[in-house]
């Protein structure tokens, strides 16, 4: 198939146009014509939208993928990445056997990658861990996981790390993208994840995008918004960003604001609502309470960093009891004039925006993604968004609500719901709550006190701890942090190459991370294994294994469970723990955690022709079903109810809580949510008093801003054709050809000032590192003067050499959207 860039973009535009016109691509006709191809369903491997894909296999290979016409999410459509899913597993450089750095027949950190057996790989890993545990606390061994990990894999990891090896140093790459959203949900509602669903799109009058380029990052949802905008009466779209991108093409109100000023804009909107008597007092009085946040909370940098001095970093997450009058006073400072001064947004646009939120007749949905979350005040800005929806009662009902969109296919279903964060357990439970720990130990049949109650090193702290020698073993799975993590020059790379440390990367390809590791483990991808994802609207979707992985590739699930056989309880648990459960003495962690009478009690069905399950063949039981049902027991009866495992293989996903076989579309609202009692109307039942929190916090400046030397803002992100670090998409010929290399987008005036022209080779320089790229002053992204935009998919241009590892001090999520940079001709 030959596809030039112009045809490629026209094709994608045609897909969006077809969606806007209500046309369904005739997938089933295509399917019927392909004789000899077996078709089955699976959720897409990429973003958090959760599109369902029909996967065509023949002769042991995936040969085609099509949008699933029976799926409610995407209705037969796929974005351009989804249409080429069949090719992601067949790059020429698949890693097909374990590779260890060796010299003279033994491990050497400076040696060359040498093929070894799985037994050799697991033996050296186990030896390293056991040696560390003899000298240090368990948090010195770590895992870096992913929002792309399946539900089963994530749950197995949590069990092995927190219960088996007794380390809370397990964190996902979702720390970099969804932590602020998750923490804000918990602080506001006492429960994680959105209350609404995608059905809001067809019921809303107004859509406001904050830091979200849905046209390229969630194109199928964007096609539904486009359809609603073009076919509905008086439907409006507002797009807000620090630069102009493709979503602006549909915007009725396009708004460009200065970095970090979204804080001031949201406080202005809250002030406008109050000053113009648009507060829904009935809702506010019944269903909310007020708190004030800690201020001057720092930037999540190393404690010795100058920006951390004199701050309230240690109490950053505190919320103090407050009332409406104090909240009113906090936001009253943010007048139209002040919001304009801080944000640079014209006053008429600010007022138009505020009126939309304040108008009780307008159904309004707010969408946001990384522009909001990757923010040194990401938790605050998320909570500010909830403030304006709570003040107006525009929440938890059809067509109204705040909606945090996830960027990965199971950032919700695995990272958040399963709990692969340093502080979490399944179903919103946390390791710092003794009751939650006791519940987990009961379900897992553990001695009391097995699960440690001190969180380990979070994602950014892992890099620092590796560099400092406090973390000595790291196993990275299903992610590429050496390319995707922040400040890799100063923090990440030194820790990975620290001779005290041993780094393992499970990866299907020789990614930037893999080639920096000590041991590479070949991993299965997507439908080479059985899996499950949870998307942004709480929809859980499962799929069956459809082909085998190449060579000696094994799923991450197989790797975790098989590796557990290399440890006996006597080697990793204290005598005090073993005395409580003497029957566990001498047993492997595999026997205690997985072959434990619960996880191993199911067998794979034999009545499905052609159905394969490599894990069941190896372990002798239906591992995925056993893990799922045990995991589901955490949430059933607690507002996180999942349907029985087998049900999910018969449907295109269900949105939890699923009670009595019925999914929940709008949480917390009577008539939709089975946990809201008759007469309550709305109950935010994650909090003991059923009330949501409205939080008063101010605008605070970013960690780093342009100055005389580093005179531009740097914002990083993605493009339509590629996903994250490009490990998969750059190996799809059509996608690589359409967008082969990273670019830097700059305003023509800024280019002229620097003697630069479109297409020039340029060098980007920050206080942390530099990178060579090419300049684009005419393309799809149009930046304002003073700001440049670039992406991170290109392994040949390591953008994260430039970025600052400042984080939100409450969520520890990284701010990739703003630091100071200078650009010169290369």
Swiss-Prot record:
SUPFAM superfamilies: ADC-like, Formate dehydrogenase/DMSO reductase, domains 1-3. Mo-bis(molybdopterin guanine dinucleotide) binds at residues 81, 148, 173, 177, 210-217, 241-245, 260-262, 370, 374, 480, 506-507, 529, 556, 716-725, 800, 817. The keyword Acetylation does not apply. The keyword Methyltransferase does not apply. CDD domains: MopB_CT_Nitrate-R-NapA-like, MopB_Nitrate-R-NapA-like. This is Periplasmic nitrate reductase. Belongs to the prokaryotic molybdopterin-containing oxidoreductase family. NasA/NapA/NarB subfamily. Binds 1 [4Fe-4S] cluster. It comes from Actinobacillus succinogenes (strain ATCC 55618 / DSM 22257 / CCUG 43843 / 130Z). Component of the periplasmic nitrate reductase NapAB complex composed of NapA and NapB. One of its GO terms (biological process) is Mo-molybdopterin cofactor biosynthetic process. Catalytic subunit of the periplasmic nitrate reductase complex NapAB. Receives electrons from NapB and catalyzes the reduction of nitrate to nitrite.
